[in-house]
A protein has these predicted regions:
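N-terminal Rossmann-like NAD(P)+-binding domain of SDR-like oxidoreductases, especially those catalyzing
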Residues: 1-125
């Protein structure tokens, strides 16, 4: 007997205002009308709210925040089926002069998401 595929209906997309994240959000919006998306983005140099502004509404909501903020994750993760994790410090040349934001976001932030996913029984795609 074939297994049923898990279909999430309420997802969080971290980094959803960046290039890759916003394209994923648009894909979900255009191809999965039964899915609600919560975009979590810190809107640093790589994120732009304009990338998703046209689809904000009933099915797509925006939360301005940082993935390192455990209290914020405790507020928004419950009730979601899955987290799709695109948030990252990605301009690696900047890490030479200032590696701390890269460690904070890419390592600690991912850890915080893993902990929240475990705590609230939520799948994490990273």
């Amino acid at each position: 007997m074939a297994e049923e595929l898990f279909t999430p209906h309420n997802i969080i997309v971290t980094g959803g205002c960046g290039f890759i994240g916003s394209n994923f959000v648009h894909y979900v919006y255009n191809n999965h009308p039964d899915v609600h998306v919560t975009v979590l983005d810190a809107l640093t140099y790589a994120g732009n709210l304009e990338n998703i502004r046209g689809i904000l509404g009933d099915r797509v909501e925006f939360v301005h925040g940082n993935i390192c903020d455990a209290e914020l994750l405790d507020k928004i993760v419950p009730g979601h089926d899955a987290i799709v994790h695109y948030a990252a410090e990605s301009h690696n040349d900047n890490s030479i002069a200032n590696p701390e934001p890269f460690l904070k976001t890419n390592v600690e932030g991912t850890f915080r998401l893993l902990e929240a996913a475990r705590k609230y029984d939520c799948l994490l795609y990273t």
